[in-house]
Amino acid sequence: MTAVENVALPALYAGVKKNERVKRAIEALESVGLGERIHHKPSEMSGGQRQRVAIARAIINNPRILLADEPTGNLDSKSGEEVLEIFKKLNDNGTTIVMVTHEEDVAEHCKRIIRLKDGVIEKDEIVYNRRGV
């Protein structure tokens, strides 16, 4: 399955017609910097590119909230920064990003940090001077 086919799947499940699905999938891939990779398969992409395909798939139906569980966990630092920049742009355009991470440097990109310990909220802070997802 190519990147554009993969990204279009949620729109298929939502009942979107094929032409509109493909158009949205291409737009989503372009928005995450993969416009030139739409016909590539996962085996032809780096880990960071595959993660951006997953983000494009998650945003194709324009969700108000995006849940991200360890979105940078398996990425090198450059690819991780690219993913966080995509999240920042999505957030700037009105999408709420709920991100789970164990990495302090990733959490530093967030506007609000809720720390859990043993399943209990230990600290809830809004941080205004962050780079902001």
Question: Where are the language model's segments positioned?
Answer:
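ABC family nucleotide-binding domain
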Residues: M1-L116
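Conserved beta-strand-loop-alpha-helix hinge in the C-terminal portion
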Residues: V120-V133
